[in-house]
Regions:
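Extended, charge-rich alpha-helical interface modules
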Residues: 1-68
């Protein structure tokens, strides 16, 4: 689908955000370094993950509305 420039920026932001989110999730779930971090830092990273996931959902909804 061809998007207007301002819409394409949202699509690009969504794509980039999801790539960063996947890396963060992989780090949290699979990297032994994560387990060695202080509990407070682990909590902050998990909160960051949740915030990024929520942000991704908002962008997904905006993109869906482009074709509505």
């Amino acid at each position: 689908m061809k998007y207007a420039p301002h819409q394409q920026r949202v699509v690009d932001e969504f794509t980039e955000l999801n790539a960063r989110l996947a890396k963060l999730e992989d780090f949290i779930q699979s990297n032994p370094i994560f387990a060695g971090l202080p509990e407070a830092e682990q909590g902050r990273m998990k909160r960051q993950q949740a915030a990024m996931a929520e942000y991704s959902q908002v962008l997904r909804e905006r993109i869906a509305a482009f074709s509505a």
